[in-house]
């Protein structure tokens, strides 16, 4: 019998990590009562969200709601754990890792952020709204500056899962060459972030 969340493409994700990818470990450090640096937590992240008809899963590794960040009394750790963040925080930061099923394509979207995208496992095609494309492999980095784009997992010619990590930071209002304000849009990704 097929799992209840099996999607039309035959690949499904039931938990993080996605099938075929290794489990990641997040280590959070801090200070002990003597002022020494210590490991406070080692785990797999606080928030996981299924996406794209369960063909992908997002793992929120950390988020901050302000800059500079208040680290006193571990308040930042408490805030990150208590609340699953929106797509991005104004004046904050998010570290998001997404496991993509084979051949999965994100919708075209533009976040009003600066995003550092790092290919952790696999091969991806990064496509801009101009039609320009780049192939990115493990260790390659993209710097998205409020640009419209989508990601396609082409690992194993679209037969294997892949993983990308992003660090999202807020940016000031962006105007294009015509002097018009650039607007963000998430397309079908919006449903995964509404109400947060």
Curated annotation (Swiss-Prot):
Highly reducing polyketide synthase; part of the gene cluster that mediates the biosynthesis of sordarial, a salicylic aldehyde structurally related to the phytotoxin pyriculol. The most interesting aspect of this pathway is formation of an aromatic product from the highly reducing polyketide synthase srdA. SrdA synthesizes a reduced polyketide chain from one molecule of acetyl-CoA and five molecules of malonyl-CoA. The polyketide chain is then reductively released as an aldehyde. GO terms for molecular function: oxidoreductase activity. Residues 99-165 are annotated as: Cupin-like domain. CDD domains: cupin_BLL6423-like. Keywords: Oxidoreductase. This is Cupin-domain-containing oxidoreductase srdD. InterPro entries: OryJ/VirC-like, RmlC-like_jellyroll, RmlC_Cupin_sf. The gene is srdD. It comes from Neurospora crassa (strain ATCC 24698 / 74-OR23-1A / CBS 708.71 / DSM 1257 / FGSC 987). Belongs to the virC family. Induction: Expression is up-regulated during sexual development. Expression is also up-regulated during confrontation with the arthropod fungivore Drosophila melanogaster. Its EC number is 1.-.-.-.
